[in-house]
Swiss-Prot record:
Main location: plastid
Function (record text): May help in the organization of the PsaL subunit.
UniProt-recorded name of the protein: Photosystem I reaction center subunit VIII
Topology in the lipid bilayer: Single-pass membrane protein
GO biological process: photosynthesis
Keywords: Chloroplast, Membrane, Photosynthesis, Photosystem I, Plastid, Thylakoid, Transmembrane, Transmembrane helix
Transmembrane segments: 6-28
Family, per entry: Belongs to the PsaI family.
Designated gene of the protein: psaI
Species, as recorded: Amborella trichopoda
Length: 36
């Protein structure tokens, strides 16, 4: 019931949210060290 709907919600959420955090953390790391 709810178990069937959870994967269809979490898969795209994780798929979009995890790369967004990775890009944000990388951007902040570059800005903090002033590599660019």
């Amino acid at each position: 019931m709810t178990d069937f709907n959870l994967p269809s919600i979490f898969v795209p959420l994780i798929g979009l949210f995890f790369p967004a955090i990775a890009m944000a953390s990388l951007f902040l790391h570059v800005q903090k060290n002033k590599i660019v």
